[in-house]
Each structure stands twice: as C-alpha cells, then as structure tokens.
Amino acid sequence: FLMMSMGPISSAQIGILPSVEITCDDPGPVEVWPGATRTTIVYCTLENPSIHSESVEIGTESEESDFQFAAPQAVTIGAGQEMDIQVMIRVPELFAAGTYSANITAKVTEANGIDVAAITSTEEDSVSFEVMKYGSCEVMMGQGGGVIEAGDPVVFAASFVCGANAEFSIGYSLVMIEEGAMSSIWPSGFE
C-alpha cells in the first residue's frame, strides 16, 4: 500500500540533525455490515527536513485492540524530501458505531546508513474516523392456513433475526386484502 510522491523542501528549512515530520489526513468512514470491506485508508506525508538520507520506521496504534493495520514497515526518504504513504485500517464486522482514533508514528532509525535510533524521537499524528451505524432484520412469517371465515381469529407467527452495531428499531405492519382483490395491489413479498 505504499504510494510514493516525492518533492524537495526549501533549503532554508533543511537541518543538520536527523528528524522526520509526519502529517496525516483523517480517513473516510467505515461500513461494517456483513460483506462490507470494513476498511478505510489514512493518507500521510513524511517529511525529511535534514541533510541526511533517512530510513524511517512506521508504526500504528489504537486504543481499540481489535483494529488491524497495514502500513509500510520502513521507508527511505532522501535529504530534504517528502514522501506520501497509505495506512489501511480494518475494523471487525458489526463493530460498535462511533468515532475512533488511531495514531501513525514515524521514527528515524538510520541516517546515511548509520544507526541513529538512540538519538531520535518518535513523531506521531492522530487521526479520527467514524464507524457507521448498521441495522438489519430478516423476517419469516407464517399462518396456520385453512379457510378463515368472517369473525374467526387469525394467528400469525413471525420470526425476527437481527444484526446491528448500534441501537435501532424497525417497524412492521399487517395489511388485510379483500378476497378477490388483484394481487398487483398487494405489498411486496405477498402473493
């Protein structure tokens, strides 16, 4: 998922010590209904403001341990250059609706081939994204059958199987159709 786009930084901003800057855009919302991709993509820009070619380690974290991340483990950024990367976040099916955050981190581990991890700090950017609400029910209905006369009680049985990631309600109604009425006026699903 590494997409590279490189460009120079102005020479007035170039520094001597190895460092990296990271900025990320908030990703789009995540749909979690059965069959959905359940993913969103974070677009980040890494900037190397130093005079060194740097190896930068990328990290991901969230308070939600169920989230899965896919990101490049490390990238190399030339002196005074920028690079764009993508981080994919995957959420479990029917995960609770709401707004969540994730952190994308970057740490310079090498400068010009020399290990500098002990003297560099981890930089991070936090993003927020929304897990969308979902609710759906399958309904199975039946009735005892036979001929029903005027005034006879009618018993219907209904079975509801619902899946949701947030509180929701759904309504159903029964429509009685006169005998001999055209079936084309019946509600969808009745014959």
Name these PLM-found stretches:
Residues 1-5:
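Bacterial N-terminal signal peptides
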Residues 9-191:
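Long beta-sheet-rich domains in secretory-pathway and surface-associated proteins
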